[in-house]
Design a protein with these regions (language model features):
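Intrinsically disordered, low-complexity segments enriched in small residues
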Residues: 1-11, 52-60, 86-286
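A generic, well-ordered mixed alpha/beta core segment in the N-terminal half of proteins
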Residues: 11, 18, 22-116
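A cross-domain feature marking catalytic cores of carbohydrate-active enzymes
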Residues: 16, 202, 289
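Conserved small/polar residues in nucleotide/adenosyl-binding loops
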Residues: 291-293
Length: 293
């Protein structure tokens, strides 16, 4: 299909980015792993990247799930209609930036970008952006972004939540720290549920502009307190055979880390090593990001 588009001259109307590559030469791997990855699992990766170049990808390294970051440059404006399919990027664009995008399939994403149009339904409409859940945050401390997102995602599934009380822990404004928190929070709502849009009272742009007018009639209520977060935390199963097995590799950055997260985690690890009198971490650790520092 992509070759047919290229041969017919139907390239994208505007430059685009793509999701992360499956392989990174900076990640440790064995000879056998390299052989299997490059000759079997991802043998078509080079061909795929050539196709994306011909279709109009932004640049040779524009492979990230956080394309909306300022450092990347694929940042939509409020109200702009998108043809995206990466779930964590869709929920961020809708919620934090106020753009409009459905949780598209890869084919809809592809075709929408080529022709410059997408079907108008769901989260592209005013009615589809109304919240059918009110989520009340009643925790005694700032909730972990991923855990809170998981709890809300599993509860509301594909519905739109209007979140009350989280602004208390985010400082009351949409600054870089709040955006980073909401990036990780939103990704969890999208992966543990199917959330494509959330509103945070006094924080996200549509919630600031419209307030409680965004809440639909007969909206359901979900209260998140310390006990509820603990319940969700304890509900996660151990998926490996040996619970006490030693990890071989640690990955951090899904979605990709922001520049500030890279700086913060580098400082945290460096300081912890210094305090422990160690020169290296005991488990090889990879920070995932498109940004190079």
């Amino acid at each position: 299909l992509m070759n047919q588009l290229i041969e017919s001259g139907n390239v994208y109307k505007q430059k685009f980015s793509a999701d992360p590559r499956p392989l990174d030469p900076n990640v440790p791997s064995s000879f056998l792993q390299d052989f299997v990855f490059k000759n079997f699992m991802y043998s078509k990766q080079d061909d795929y990247e050539k196709q994306l170049t011909q279709l109009g990808i932004m640049e040779k390294d524009a492979y990230t799930c956080t394309c909306y970051m300022d450092e990347v440059g694929n940042t939509p404006a409020m109200g702009e209609v998108l043809s995206w399919s990466e779930s964590s990027a869709v929920v961020y664009a809708n919620s934090v930036l106020g753009a409009r995008c459905n949780r598209n399939s890869g084919i809809i994403d592809l075709m929408g970008s080529v022709v410059g149009y997408v079907p108008r339904f769901g989260l592209l409409t005013d009615e589809g952006r109304k919240a059918t859940w009110i989520v009340k945050i009643e925790t005694t401390k700032k909730p972990e972004a991923q855990l809170l997102g998981s709890a809300i995602g599993m509860k509301v599934m594909a519905d739109v939540p209007y979140i009350v009380g989280l602004d208390k822990w985010l400082g009351g404004e949409l600054d870089d720290a709040a955006k980073t928190y909401l990036k990780d929070f939103g990704a969890a709502t999208a992966s543990n549920g199917a959330v494509g849009l959330y509103h945070v009272e006094n924080i996200t742009p549509e919630a600031v502009k419209y307030g409680k007018d965004l809440i639909a009639e007969d909206a359901k209520v979900y209260v998140v307190d310390d006990a509820e977060l603990q319940r969700v935390y304890e509900s996660y199963p151990v998926i490996w055979k040996k619970k006490d097995a030693k990890p071989k590799l640690c990955f951090m950055g899904c979605p990709h880390m922001s520049l500030q997260q890279l700086i913060d985690w580098t400082e945290k690890v460096s300081q912890s090593l210094k305090e422990a009198g160690r020169a290296r971490v005991c488990i090889p650790t990879v920070f995932l990001s498109l940004i190079h520092i």
